[in-house]
């Protein structure tokens, strides 16, 4: 997949505000601060396309980006951030689970996992949820450049143990660009 253009389309906080256009949607999901927005900026070669922050929980809406005028990349709020109040967590959880389980135009979910913490219960639960919904998904191990060689192998092995139906596992570094071409090839399969 070659990304020729990428633009922000809209942010939504409710299911009834989702785009009516039925373009294929590739959804990016993961824990807070795993690097979803950074990955989107890296993939599209647009540094400020998705807002990034070192503060967990910055993305609080479903953010849509139009890619090549033929599909959407969708940046979801991160899960697992402890400092968000319980009411907000519940609302996010309800919105996101309804969106992921019922949205017909989702062609792929990309589960981002911090390679430094590959065995988090919340990531296990998300992989289980995606498998339960029957959603095709792939895994991207983020911040891969921060690991030593032995830790890289251990991280991949840990993720393989619970993401049994994952279509792919890509090691990714937004800094070096490692994994970018491989991930774009995988995404091309699901964008029609």
UniProtKB/Swiss-Prot annotation:
Example GO molecular function: metal ion binding
Residues bound to GTP: 30-37, 57-61, 75-78, 142-145, 172-174
InterPro entries for the chain: G_ENGB_dom, GTP-bd, GTP-bd_ribosome_bio_YsxC, P-loop_NTPase
Residues the record lists as binding Mg(2+): 37, 59
Record's keyword annotation contains Cell cycle: yes
One term under GO cellular component: cytosol
Keywords: Cell cycle, Cell division, GTP-binding, Magnesium, Metal-binding, Nucleotide-binding, Septation
The UniProt record lists the keyword Nucleotide-binding: yes
Cited function: Necessary for normal cell division and for the maintenance of normal septation.
Name listed for the protein in its UniProt record: Probable GTP-binding protein EngB
